[in-house]
């Protein structure tokens, strides 16, 4: 397969995603096919975002690593020393993707390391490995192109996470601001007693202890529930089951108490 055909194969994968998140496993499979090498997409913390195996490596440690989808911490940290594409590293290199305890079996093993960079920061590493055949310029062009695509995808996911976090925080702040002074006081006492993200409580007991009416507690819970911040369910004489749905809620509530 010529370079242009291989590039088109990678492009076809991106175009088929059509604005949806690129599946790192599918991306790895395609890279594995066009570059003809074992492919590992490694995050900053060593998490295996995606991988594909072209040549099986019979080694228990490697199998466990793939099963856990996690690269060793020391190896991951060492990868940060590689700031530009380093190709055809042999089994004696500290960056080899072959098991060092089996150097005699993988003497012809070659590894290529491609940093994944986006937005001016290191986002991860693309690790390629194969036996007996050097990585040529065409392979490196495809690898660097793939690393750029992966970097853009990681940045997109990070932006979505930040956006979702901001949205969750805004929902909580709006829900809390909709509470009256007595309702806010009731909510503070409820979650002080709950002491966690879910549990069972008796509203009448809290109302008596704090000196507010039960209707204030009911209204406060209803407001938070309609905002999607909590879930509440009456269990009759047993009390009310409450579960926090928005993980920003308790933090924002705690901030109010300290201010």
Swiss-Prot record:
The keyword Transcription applies. It is found in: Cytoplasm. Keywords: Cytoplasm, DNA-binding, Phosphoprotein, Repressor, Transcription, Transcription regulation. Residues 1-155 are annotated as: GAF domain. Coiled coil: none annotated. The modification Phosphoserine is found at residue 215. InterPro entries: CodY (IPR014154), GAF-like_dom_sf (IPR029016), GTP_trans_reg_CodY_C (IPR013198), Transc_reg_CodY_N (IPR010312), WH-like_DNA-bd_sf (IPR036388), WH_DNA-bd_sf (IPR036390). One of its GO terms (cellular component) is cytoplasm. Residues 203-222 bind DNA. The keyword Transferase does not apply. Belongs to the CodY family. DNA-binding global transcriptional regulator which is involved in the adaptive response to starvation and acts by directly or indirectly controlling the expression of numerous genes in response to nutrient availability. During rapid exponential growth, CodY is highly active and represses genes whose products allow adaptation to nutrient depletion. This is Global transcriptional regulator CodY. The lineage of its organism: Bacteria, Bacillati, Bacillota, Bacilli, Bacillales.
């Amino acid at each position: 397969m010529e370079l242009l055909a291989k590039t088109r194969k990678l492009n076809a994968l991106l175009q088929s995603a059509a604005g949806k998140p690129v599946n790192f496993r599918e991306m790895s499979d395609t890279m594995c096919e066009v570059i003809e090498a074992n492919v590992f997409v490694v995050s900053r913390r060593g998490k295996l975002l995606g991988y594909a195996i072209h040549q099986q490596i019979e080694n228990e440690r490697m199998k466990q690593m793939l099963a856990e989808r996690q690269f060793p911490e020391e190896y991951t940290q060492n990868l940060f020393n590689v700031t530009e594409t380093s190709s055809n590293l042999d089994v004696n290199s500290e960056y080899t993707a072959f098991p060092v305890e089996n150097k005699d079996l993988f003497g012809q093993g070659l590894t290529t390391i491609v940093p994944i960079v986006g937005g001016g920061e290191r986002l991860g590493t693309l690790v390629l490995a194969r036996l007996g055949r050097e990585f040529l310029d065409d392979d490196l062009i495809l690898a660097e192109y793939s690393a750029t695509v992966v970097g853009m995808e990681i940045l997109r996911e990070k932006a979505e996470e930040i956006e979702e976090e901001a949205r969750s925080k805004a929902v909580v702040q709006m829900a809390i601001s909709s509470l009256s002074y007595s309702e806010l006081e009731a909510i503070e006492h409820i979650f002080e007693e709950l002491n966690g993200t879910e549990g069972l409580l008796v509203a009448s007991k809290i109302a008596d202890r704090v000196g507010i009416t039960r209707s204030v507690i009911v209204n406060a819970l209803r407001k938070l529930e309609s905002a999607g911040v909590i879930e509440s369910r009456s269990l009759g004489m047993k009390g009310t089951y409450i579960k926090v749905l928005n993980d920003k809620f308790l933090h924002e509530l705690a901030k109010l108490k300290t201010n």
